[in-house]
Amino acid sequence: MRRLQKTLKSVLLPALLTVMAAFASAQSINAIDPALRERIDRIARQVLEQTGVPSASVAIVQHGKIVYTHAYGSAHLATDKTPAIPAVPEMRYSIGSISKQFTATAILLLQEEGKLSIDDPVGKYLPGLTRGDEVTIREILSHTSGYQDYWPEDYVMTTMLHPESAQQILDMWGKKTLDFEPGTQWQYSNTNFVIAGCIVEKVTGEPYMDFLTHHIFRPLGMISVWNSDQAKLTGDDATPYYRHALGPLRVAPKEGLGWMFAAGELSMTAHDLALWDESLIAQSILKPESYKQMFEEVKLKNGQGTHYGLGVDVRDRDGHRSIEHGGEVSGFVSENEVLIDDGVAAVVLTNQDAVGAAATIAHLAAPVVAGYPPTPAEQQAIEIYRGLQQGRIDRSLLAPNLSDYFTPEALADFQSSLAPLGDPLTFHQTHEELRGGMTFRAFEIVYPSKKLELTTYTYPDGKLEQYLIAPAE
């Protein structure tokens, strides 16, 4: 009993104070430029309006630090008995498969301690898996193992409403014939990360969540983390929703215990996931070599790229390195994008499954926060676009053919169709090549509910031969 009292005094009280401080900061962070905040707010609100998703909780990292947290919409929809409850930053959402990067980090921590190597065969730690003496830990963390996915469906099957242990998942899916030869294909598979989580437990001798808490969550101050694999979120958190086809939103069913182990079990606030992003940017949990392994695109045996590292998607965003991942479990969809070299991250957590609102908001917000300046070609295209929305064009920019094209009728059509759209969320160049002695460029113009494609041809003297807009395919 004395030991318990000492623990309560020395651990729980400071932890409680940390919780209170963290929740307060999550609620009050607004250190972002007002104009930038307005753009992010507009993106989030318009995407929610267009998609019908009830709510989004957003956290923004700039210059390596959290500068903005905000929540939009309703965390709980109104019923006959209760009013709608607005979303607030303190509410937790399930982050789904974003959890995988925490599992990958646990493995890399164990490698740093000399307790395993990511090039070890999985059978060294978990005997009995199909071709476990050949498939490596690196291959399970990069989805190149060949182990069949136990949950490819985008809904909760009846069987998943009942408890299932990690060992039962491995016995059922980890002992099937591989879908392909290890290292020869990329195929997303939740089974891989159940295997990885079991390896963490086997090597450490402690529960997976305990290891993450001691080595990641507690050091980073991520005090809101919740194990959704063992218990559903509380009434103070966001309610998960889904719908059948175009029907009404309904409270989503909860997966049974065990199904999300190590592959999608974490829930937290957007603020706390942004704390994790701060650590990725600062490289504060792992050694530099481990982050290099995590962020490096894994290649197949034939040299083909996979756009995947270890537990993370690895993308090029207009010449900027993006480390990202989405997540979906019953009633929740999330997106976490980190422009790692720019010190920028966008966390978006939403409470409706099967809808891409989270990814749309994150992918629109991140480059805005990074402040990528428009190229001269983009700037010119944007200025012409704004003029066309007002029914005018600067003919000094146009070659004779294009000047002839923009008749009063054409200008009227451009104005009547583009003006109601207002300012686009983003406007950027996607392609450039030389053709017919001119420079061809393609641009993507993004609105919450639609995308447009602009194509131009420019002569060496700078005169425009084409400026055409059509719906993007």
For each of these PLM feature ranges, what is it?
Residues 29-93, 115-120, 175, 320:
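Short, conserved catalytic-motif segment at the N-terminal edge
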Residues 392-437:
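Short solvent-exposed beta->alpha transition segments
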Residues 11-22:
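Bacterial N-terminal signal peptides
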Residues 432-473:
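Exposed beta-sheet edge and beta->alpha loop/turn motif
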Residues 70, 74-76, 133-330, 335, ...:
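Short, surface-exposed loop or secondary-structure junction motifs
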Residues 49-57, 79-140, 178-191, 261-264, ...:
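Short active-site loop at a secondary-structure junction
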Residues 324-325, 335-352, 454-455, 464-470:
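Short, well-ordered beta-strand elements
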Residues 348-410, 472:
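Short, gly/Ser/Thr-rich active-site loops of penicillin-recognizing serine hydrolases
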